Amino acid sequence: MSGAGDASQSPRPDRLLAIRNSIARGERSVREVVTDAIERMSSGNARTNALTQIFADEAMVRAAELDAARSSLGPAGTLPPLFGVPMIIKDNICTRLGRTTCASRMLENYRSPFDATCVRRLVEAGAVIVAKSNLDEFAMGGSGEHSAFGPTRNPWDHSRVPGGSSSGSAAAVAAGYAPAALGSDTGGSIRQPAALCGLTGIKPTYGRVSRLGLVAFASSLDQVGPMAHAAADVAPVLEAIMGHDPGDSTSLDADARQGSELLTTPIVGLRLGVPSQARSSANHASVSRVLEQTIATFRAAGATIVDIDLPHADAGIAAYYIIAPAEASSNLARYDGVRFGRRAAVTQGEPLEAMYTRSRTEGFGSEVQRRIMLGTHVLSSGYYDAYYLTALRARRLIKRDFDRAFSRDPGMPGVHAVLMPAT
């Protein structure tokens, strides 16, 4: 792999709001914007391997429809918020366009009969779906290397990983293929690749964005979220996809402040908590330096920096690697070669179990198999109490630590946000 990457060799791509506003002012057509995105993807994807599918023909049809409708939509201010904006979708989110593969041989030919709620809402907001992105298989991984389609490469430096599991979404946006993309985050899968590719990414509050149409990994942890070059570009995408969905029983009913409103919140008076654990001696020196610079920047802007303690945070990784595989072993049991996924050939007379075993062995990669085995182990009768129930107790203690940090009760820190490294 070459050392230099696409992102360092090309000019910074247009930001989401700039694209949308240029279309609204009539300076560019949707066709021009989408054509540019398709050209970037077609010429660059061989180097980054960020995309599993490019929808060139379908995107151009959609662009023509939007351009034709432009004259009937009234003044620029009445245009849908993402009108004409190219968007990339992580390939574990269902789309009627193309296939939904989860970067796995198990689903390499699967075509969804419906769009995920988040995808439908993007289209309703005027977005143009131009591609689906590579990922660690079934969203299990943190480097972008565990994919049936091959590893994703960081566009800033092809010798480095982009992070994962939303590796393709992050690499695609950083390389300028589209101004924003959807990913999914179970244990850092939006935030970590966004950090490694120099982007802004958010894992929304659980239930804020519908999971209907997201292929399940660990259902109590999975969330869909956006990534883009800056918070101002993430906000309109999050606004478009958030909201209650009766098709998702975990979807929140409560109203939430819009992202654009939060962007205008004054820094002066904000209370930002810095956990003692974030200043760990285990941090890389460059991470510690950037953290302290960020703290100083917020303090200079008028924020109040509050030292807080999250005493059970160190148990988070251990709890995650018990809870997530346990849920995955249950969720992925449906891929048996009968109901879903790849079906291996069997000879006449072989038992049904042979077809199950062969289908799953051929269909799942090594990382997915490892996690299924781990999850099955911690749920087994001899270890359920010692591992799984202990991990659930640890999660409750971690949640309590954060609840106390955000509490406005007398004597509590009462912070508005917690400031800590993403990786």
Predicted regions and their residues:
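Short glycine/serine-rich loop segments
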Residues: 114-244
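An N-terminal boundary/leader segment
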Residues: 1-60, 293, 300-302
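DPxDG-like acidic metal-binding loop motif
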Residues: 96-109, 175-177
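Conserved small-residue hinge/capping positions at short loops/turns
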Residues: 75-102, 128-131, 135, 298, ...
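Acyltransferase
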Residues: 30-35, 64-67, 258-259, 283-310, ...
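A short helix-breaking turn/cap at a secondary-structure junction
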Residues: 203-294, 352-358
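Short helix-loop capping/hinge segments that flank enzyme active sites or metal/cofactor-binding pockets
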Residues: 81-102, 264-275, 326-399
